[in-house]
Amino acid sequence: MRYFIFYIVIIVSSSLNAHQPKIINYSPNIDEPHEVVYPEISKAYYGQLKGEPHYYVIRNEEDFLFYTSILSPKVNENYTWLSLEVLDENQNLIYKADGSKFNWTAWYEPYARDWYWKGPEIGIKTEKEFQSSFPINGGTYFIKVYNDNNTG
């Protein structure tokens, strides 16, 4: 069974420690998205697509720093690509990270001692291993995780 790991990093304060893991064992949809509670705390969502895309919602009145990415456990040399979209409150596309056109790379996570496929990110490119957060206006945002057949 393959699970994707979806990171949301939203920073509204200057202190950021380790992320909070959250297991998503249902399929949050656009009408009932998974609420990102306390968005100022970095989160890692663990989920599995079972025929429908997953939706997450961030409601934040204040401007904040935003970053999101996707990882998938590396169980063999093949990966299932996944994409990310950020939509505004009217479900208009704001940002897209197309996993089908992304060069997925193997990445070792030293704390968990696990290998992952590192997928696309929505952030500011850096010279580092991962992109960084960028300023975004306060408001309501939906994050969609999907692929062609919504499995993985």
Where are these regions (language model features)?
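Positively charged n-region of N-terminal signal peptides that target proteins for export
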Residues: 1-5
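Hydrophobic helical h-region of N-terminal Sec-dependent signal peptides
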Residues: 6-10
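N-terminal signal peptide c-region/cleavage motif recognized by signal peptidases
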Residues: 13-15
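Non-catalytic extracellular/lumenal accessory regions of secreted precursors
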Residues: 17-55
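Juxtadomain low-complexity/linker regions and immediately adjacent membrane-anchoring helices
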Residues: 19-30, 79, 104-105, 148-150
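Mature extracellular "passenger" or substrate-interacting domains of secreted, surface-exposed proteins
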Residues: 35-41, 52-54, 61-69, 105-126
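Hydrophobic beta-strand segments within beta-rich accessory/binding domains
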Residues: 55-75, 141-148
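Noncatalytic accessory or regulatory domains flanking protease catalytic cores in secreted, cell-surface
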Residues: 81-152
